[in-house]
Amino acid sequence: MIQLFDYYNQETQDLHDSLLAAGYACPTIVIEANGFLPDDMISPYTYFLGDEEGVDHPLFFNQVPVPPFWEITGDHQVARVSDMGEERARIHYASQARGRLVKQVDWLDKKGQLRLSERYNKQGRCFAKTAYKSGQEAFNTTYYSTDGQERIVENHVTGDIILTLDQEPLRIFKSRVDFIRFFLERLDLDLDHILFNSLAYSFLVSHSLTGRAGQDILFWQEPLYDELPGNMQLILDNSQLRTQTIVIPDLATYEKAMSLAAADQQQKFLHLGYHYDFKRDNYLRKDALILTHSDQIEGLDTLVQSLPQLVFRIAALTEMSPKLLSMLSYKNVVLYQNASLKQIEQLYLESDIYLDINHGGQVLQAVRKAFENNLLILGFEQTLHDRHYIAQQHIFDSSQPAQLASILEEALCGVEQMRSALQAQGRHANDVPVSLYQETLQSLLGGQHG
């Protein structure tokens, strides 16, 4: 059994963690050449580049090599390389939550068109470069071994992939699927079950194994619209494929799929959420956290005045404006300007409520972090940054700060009230007990696989 994913993102991580919690610890492959994959995941592209030596030491944004006298400037969202005021490159971070660590550098020509992308890994090494013909049209990507040798060249126009390994004949693959199949066979992985979450390359790999004994499962983690995707309909129509089950974690998406599928095909769909490993319990403390880039915090004065028993802890990664600093006139407001990542982590541990009420961009994936720490999350419709983790009954119009305060006050009345509110939050995020995850997968796969 293997887990096979096209990309690494939060949904992939949630599925992977749920499978691990249920006892399905099997090789996990991410097709995307991501230099910041967790240690228990591997990409076919980076596998052939050789082992990275030493501990993780990602490149910080101002360590990107640039020509003399060029300038690097950055904030917590993105960084830029400039030459005499002209933008020459954009630096993308691996993750907001991890600080300004470099994942990719996009180099621009004098017309501002993308010409070259350099990808970095968590050891701070540039391991791949993608050349562009015009703007956004990628031409080829070259992957470099740890000793700087060209190891893989992928032509994005023809689809060919050339693999050069020491003391082995040069190999040419006509498609990415062929390359992935070679990788799987080289590792001699058991392909009796493939658990995958994409109808792109992951599905094509499964489809290429049609006729070979095995039972695969698609975990569909994307929205559905007016019709089912073509490859999903192919699964429903073809009983000869290895994939005969489509698991959908999101309840609303599952219900949409059932409404779009023919009656005799609906049995192929199954709803099964995620098992989240919450970092701690909620202790019912009257401490509310707000992370913000902006001094525009919806309904703040009303909430602070309506809930004098609640301490509002407001943190920013930068200096705060006079408007925000004036909130110190309230005894139940504590401000943290120029807060460090370590300090923010501590604030999550000290708070049991998160208010998603700041305008502007989200800070450090704040809503998800609050959810992981079992904080009760409430917000206004006009300021939401990630509604996936906020129960509908905890979302209010910005003209209703009094209603938000009332629900918050009710949740703080006692353990049962807070438990009920957190259960609603978990249901909305499709949280399920690990026992249900185990039972469902055992019924599909016939037992645990490790």
Swiss-Prot record:
Gene disruption phenotype: Loss of export of cell wall protein GspB; transcription should not be affected. Non-glycosylated GspB may form aggregates.
Subcellular location: Cell membrane
Stated consequence of mutating E222A: Significant defect in glycosylation of GspB in vivo and in vitro, significantly decreased binding of partially glycosylated GspB. Nearly complete loss of glycosylation and binding to partially glycosylated GspB
Outcome following mutation: D14A: Mild defect in early glycosylation of GspB. Nearly complete loss of glycosylation and binding to partially glycosylated GspB
Function: Required for polymorphic O-glycosylation of GspB, a serine-rich repeat cell wall protein encoded upstream in the same operon. A substrate-binding protein that is part of the accessory SecA2/SecY2 system specifically required to export GspB. The GtfA-GtfB complex adds GlcNAc from UDP-GlcNAc to GspB, attaching the first sugar residue. Upon coexpression in E.coli with GtfA glycosylates GspB constructs. Binds the GspB protein substrate; alone this subunit only recognizes partially glycosylated GspB, but is constrained by GtfA to also recognize unglycosylated protein.
Full protein name: UDP-N-acetylglucosamine--peptide N-acetylglucosaminyltransferase stabilizing protein GtfB
InterPro entries: GtfB
Source species of the chain: Streptococcus gordonii
Keyword hit for Membrane: yes
Gene: gtfB
